[in-house]
């Protein structure tokens, strides 16, 4: 009976019954190079004005191509969106792939993988490519870049250690072209309407996890400097707290009114099920021409909360939308806050090792070692202490 079923029917049945997306099945190489699930890619694309996909002039760039999933999903939307503009399907595909989609691969391996995803061939000039280029790269380039080390042994662009990344030609340098040039605009020599990516997150500094050096901020900053109409990237959410070289990045991001959308996953596994990334993950939309308050969505423990907020409203970034109304209520009471009477470290100029003496003095000192005494003259920052009676100063807690 099976012999009587045509190959076409079997093929059609297979497509309907089982048609997995291979890019959703790939394992991540490491926490440095995280592959983006197609579902997340499309959520990011949904944030963009959809008319971008109906214009034959919109140019898209992924400056950190891994699997090619961003360019592939954009191509799908353009092929559908330009149907009325360029009716002939092959002409439409040729135009889109040659004039609208561009990428910079992060390694030689990912350049081959991404061309296979987009062009159906790892070489864009092969007979198997869905559109023919004169060169093997097509519009997905990979250029082997060396780090530029200074006298201290650190790369001037990304801070990589010379002892760890000054390697032989047989190994990857992880010197990504997008952030290892003074003139990224010259890579393709054109302006882009949309820059979209999931950049490498960190470089190992002979530690791992939280101790590794973050580099994703350099991809964001470089993209901003090129002033595309829209920028969207998915990055670790650790920048909310700063530290590890992220303080200035945190400040500029929270102050940037062009960050009009953030989707925040407190647990990174809700977004990338196969990685362990402390601090969560987020993706954002930067809109060059329409600065506004940010529509911020927080996702934790299956709870989804969205509020339109000013990101730098408080000195500390408040991650949970549910806390905003509580903070406003507390502030409205105009009462003295704990921060006015509690110091994080050495608030009176006293060392944390100070225990005082057992002999009674003017000031009582409470510490982890018990109760001691200290003369008034031995307190460097006496002005911080409220003395109600000159002869009997109030005791202080330390």
What spans do the regions from the language model cover?
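Intrinsic-disorder/low-complexity loop/linker signature
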Residues: 138-139, 301-302, 371
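SAM-dependent methyltransferase catalytic region
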Residues: 2-262, 267-271, 280, 284, ...
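Single conserved hydrophobic/aromatic residue that forms the stacking wall/gate
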Residues: 385-398
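Sequence-specific dsDNA recognition surfaces
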Residues: 368-383
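ER/Golgi luminal nucleotide-sugar-dependent glycosyltransferases, focusing on the catalytic module
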Residues: 357
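Single, function-defining residue in the core of a domain
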Residues: 362-366
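Flexible, glycine-/basic-rich loop-and-beta segments that form/coincide
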Residues: 275-354
